[in-house]
Amino acid sequence: MSTSGTTKGIPIPLNIFKRKSIPFGRISRVTPKPEQLLHPFYRPGNVSSLGLCMKEGKPALLDSKSIIPSIVQNSKTGNPVLANCSLAFSSVQGVSTWLKQYENLRETRTTPFSTIPFPDLNRYLTSLPKSKVEIIEKAYTNLINNDGSHISKGIILELVHELSSDFELAVFSENILIFFLNDKVSKRSELACVLEAAFDLLDTHIDQPKTIYKFLMAFFAKYFEVPVQTDTDLNTLMVKLLMKLENKFHLESMYSKMVPELTEALFSFYTREGNLHEANIAINDLIKKGFIPKSEDIENYLTLINTKYPGHNSQDYMWRLFHIAHFEGLIQSSDHPNLLKFLVQNCRHREEIETVFTIVAKNKNSKILLEHLTAPVIDSISNMKMHRVPKSSLLSDYYKMMKFAFNNELSHQLKLLLLQGYITFGNFSMSAKIIEDNHLNLTVDIANKLIKIIKHNNKLFKGIDCPGFSEEALALFLECYIKPFEDELNQHSKKWLIRQQHYCK
C-alpha cells in the first residue's frame, strides 16, 4: 500500500515508559497500519468509508493529506519514528480489511474510566507517632545548636545516620524525611534539600519502592502548599530520584507499582513544573489503567502542550496530537469543554471536525459544550485550506446541531457568533437567514463589527457567482441590514459603505 516520495520522521522512544533516544531518520511514505495510528479522535464517516471501498485507482481518506500522526518504521534503519502520514492506498484491494481492523481497534480503546479517589495527602505528613516526632525534634535541636543551620541535605543525612544506628529507637530514614516535610519546610529550596537527601538515602537506607512512594505522597502534600516560585529546579531532582528508584529495583516502569493517587500527584507536579515529557508518561499510565486525572490537571496539561508547541505548522500539529494520542476513550465520554476545544483547534480537515461534531452531539452535556465551542469551531474552519463555500457548509452542519440541541432557542451571543462566521465565509444569504430566523436585533456596534469583517475578507468575495456568495448578495445584505445604520456608523465604516454603494452601482 505504499506511495512514492519521502517525508521526515521524528525519533520517539521505543517504549513510552523508557527514555532511550532513537536516531533521526527519513521514512518512505507508506499507509500506516491501524495499530500505528496515533490520531486521538478521527474516525472515517460512513460515506467516506463507503467511498474508499468503491473508488477505483488510488483511494484515500482525508484527501490524501499527511496529517495523521503515526509510528512507522524507518525504511533504512528499521527503527520506529513519529511522522505525519496520509491514509492513501495504492489500490482498493485490502481497504475493507484495513477499515474493519481500524474500527475494531478503536472500539477496544473506548473502555469506561474511573475517577481516582483522591486522598487527603496531609495525612501522610502527619502520619508519624508523637513519640518519634519528639525523638527527631530533640536530635534536630541539638544538631542545629552546634551547626547554626536550619535545614540542609547535610543535616538530614546526619540525623538519619545518628538515629537509624540506634535500633531501639526504631526511627527510620523515611520518618526523618517526613518529619522535615511536616514541621520544617516552607519554601521550594527546602523541598529541594529533602529531595536531595532522599536521593542519597536510596543508596544506603531505603530498600523498598513503597518507602519512596510513601515519602512522595508526603512530599506532594507539602509541595502543593508551598508558594510557586521559579528559583529552584525541583523537576530535575524528581526525575533523577525516580530514575534511580527504577534502576535500583529493576522496575519495568517507575509507575508499575504506584497507586493511581501517586501517579496523579506526579502528573500534576510535572504539569506545574513544565515537564511535558514526564507528564505525558504519567497521564498515559493513568489512562492505560482506566483512571481519569482531575479536570484542572488535564486543562493544565493541554495548556502546557500549547505552550511547548504553539505553531500552526505540521510538526507542531503532529506533536500536539501525539501528546493526547491515548485520550481516545476519554474523549468519547468527556464533558470537559477545554478538551473538546483543544480537539477543534487541532483539526485541519473537514472530516476531523465532523468527527468532533459527532462526539459533541452524542454527549449528554452537548448544550454546555456547544456554548464553549462555537467561537473555536468558526476559527478552526476559517483556518482550513479550502474554499469558503464548503467552509460555510461546515458551519451550517454545526448550526443545525445547535438548533436541535437548544430547540431553536439560541442565546444572543451564539446568534451573533454564527452571523459573524457566515459573514467571514462570505455567505450573505445565510447571514440574512440567521438575522431573520432568530429575530436578531442588530445595533450600530454590530453593524460596525460586520463591516470590519467584510473589509478584512473583501478580496475573497470577488468573482464568485455562487448564490448567496456573490457581490450582488453582498450588496443586498448591506442594503437591508447595514444601510439603516449609515448615519450612526463610525467614520471608517461610513466611508467604506459609501464607496461600496458607489461601486455596486
UniProtKB/Swiss-Prot annotation:
A GO term for molecular function: translation regulator activity
Superkingdom of the organism of origin: Eukaryota
Record: transit peptide: 1-30
Main location (coarse class): mitochondrion
Subcellular compartments: Mitochondrion
Coiled coil regions, renumbered to chain: none
Keywords, alphabetical: Mitochondrion, Transit peptide, Translation regulation
Gene Ontology CC: mitochondrion
Its job: Required for translation of the mitochondrial OLI1 transcript encoding subunit 9 of mitochondrial ATP synthase.
Family: Belongs to the AEP1 family.
Protein name: ATPase expression protein 1, mitochondrial
Organism this protein belongs to: Candida glabrata (strain ATCC 2001 / BCRC 20586 / JCM 3761 / NBRC 0622 / NRRL Y-65 / CBS 138)
